[in-house]
């Protein structure tokens, strides 16, 4: 995965009508209020963040592109960052008995890699790109250096993980139920 500067056209794929240089200094990083509101609504990890705080958070992101077929990271890699998809699609996979099992298919607005921020820094799954990706990468130290943003992001990570745990519990109950019936 290679860091890249993103021109306004790429940012526009993520949020319509953006007219900003995303790599500009925080003080000059500006987005239209309607775009900020759209990002807060469509990207759960930023939900509840003030507009000013969101602009500051977006300004510290590293913008990355990854081609279809490539891996973003492998299960058991050490992680210190999470990603927000701007465009493209990834599969989240775990290896079981030597075979990749797909856990989720994620697209624009979804985040991944967040468990490394709240857990033991070890990636819990492999993330494989199925359609060329442009993503924002946020490093733990930059998030933690900004307590107001960190509080909102970690709260939203907790909500996202709780939702995923609920979905996993339902699947597990279904599997156990099917097993008991046979």
Predicted segments, located by residue:
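Cytosolic regulatory regions built on CNB/CRP/Popeye-like sensor folds
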Residues: 1-182
